[in-house]
């Protein structure tokens, strides 16, 4: 596998260049704006292309070193593509409301994950002894925890990189990542500030096609990193293919 390729045409067709209404702009994004058309800011894709490419390299390299990536997108149109992209590359996601302390208070979050796993087990195997009301309460608790934590239940610790759609909506996630020194890759639209984002992808963060394109590219970059990691492991294992000869004891 190789780093996923994309073209300027693909970005245009997905509407990546369409920003927000000029009245809603954030001056901190001025350097990434090409101009405006009919009251809408147009993102300078000649900058987006190399910056997206750099972001994909960071994703690939993080996974190649055995790192964990957390995909974050809680707005309605991002929820499904974020979850699908993370699952496709065996990474982790948060696509409902960001839970305060997900990163900075991982110990408490991991206790909630343990509770979710416990509920799964009880409801799958040993629910016979429960009353109808007890079972119903457990199922409700399970559904609530699954919606909040299902995408990070196998993360096993804080991630090594965040990939975010819509930095305005996910400002809490960025603040927590900054506090812990976790790098952030994010799509930043013309109405938001790139502050706190280590690898900015200037572009539309609302159009379904644009979101699907970002998610697909990041997922494929992670898969490329996984392939590189497995290849490296294969080389190490290959050196151990020949079993050491056993010394025979003389009678």
Curated annotation (Swiss-Prot):
Keyword Ribonucleoprotein: yes
Any one GO biological process: translation
Keywords: Ribonucleoprotein, Ribosomal protein
KW Nuclease (keyword) present: no
One Pfam family cited in the UniProt record for this chain: Ribosomal_S2
InterPro entries referenced in this protein's UniProt entry, alphabetically: Ribosomal_uS2 (IPR001865), Ribosomal_uS2_bac/mit/plastid (IPR005706), Ribosomal_uS2_CS (IPR018130), Ribosomal_uS2_flav_dom_sf (IPR023591)
Domain of life, source organism: Bacteria
Record GO terms (molecular function): structural constituent of ribosome
Entry GO terms, CC: cytosolic small ribosomal subunit
Family: Belongs to the universal ribosomal protein uS2 family.
The protein's name: Small ribosomal subunit protein uS2
Biological source species: Cereibacter sphaeroides (strain ATCC 17029 / ATH 2.4.9)
Species classification: Bacteria, Pseudomonadati, Pseudomonadota, Alphaproteobacteria, Rhodobacterales
């Amino acid at each position: 596998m190789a780093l996923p390729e994309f073209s300027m045409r693909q970005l245009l067709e997905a509407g990546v260049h369409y920003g927000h209404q000029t009245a809603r702009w954030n001056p901190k994004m001025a350097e990434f704006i090409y101009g405006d058309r009919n009251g809408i800011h147009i993102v300078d894709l000649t900058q987006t292309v190399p910056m997206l490419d750099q972001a994909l390299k960071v994703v690939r390299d993080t996974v190649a070193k055995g790192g964990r990536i957390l995909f974050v997108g809680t707005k309605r149109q991002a929820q499904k593509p974020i979850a699908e992209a993370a699952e496709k590359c065996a990474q982790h996601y948060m696509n409902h409301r960001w839970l305060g302390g997900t990163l900075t208070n991982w110990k408490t979050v991991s206790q909630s994950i343990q509770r979710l796993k416990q509920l799964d087990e009880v409801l799958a195997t040993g629910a016979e002894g429960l009353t109808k009301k007890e079972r119903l309460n457990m199922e409700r608790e399970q559904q609530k925890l699954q919606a909040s934590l299902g995408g990070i239940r196998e993360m096993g610790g804080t991630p090594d990189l965040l990939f975010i759609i819509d930095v305005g909506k996910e400002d809490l996630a960025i603040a927590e990542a900054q506090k812990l020194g976790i790098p952030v890759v994010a799509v930043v639209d013309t109405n938001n500030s790139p502050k706190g984002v280590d690898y900015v992808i200037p572009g539309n963060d609302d159009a379904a096609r644009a979101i699907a394109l970002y998610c697909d590219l990041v997922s494929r970059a992670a898969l490329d990193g996984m392939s590189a990691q497995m290849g490296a492991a294969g080389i190490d294992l290959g050196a151990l293919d020949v079993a050491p000869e056993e010394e025979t004891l003389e009678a």
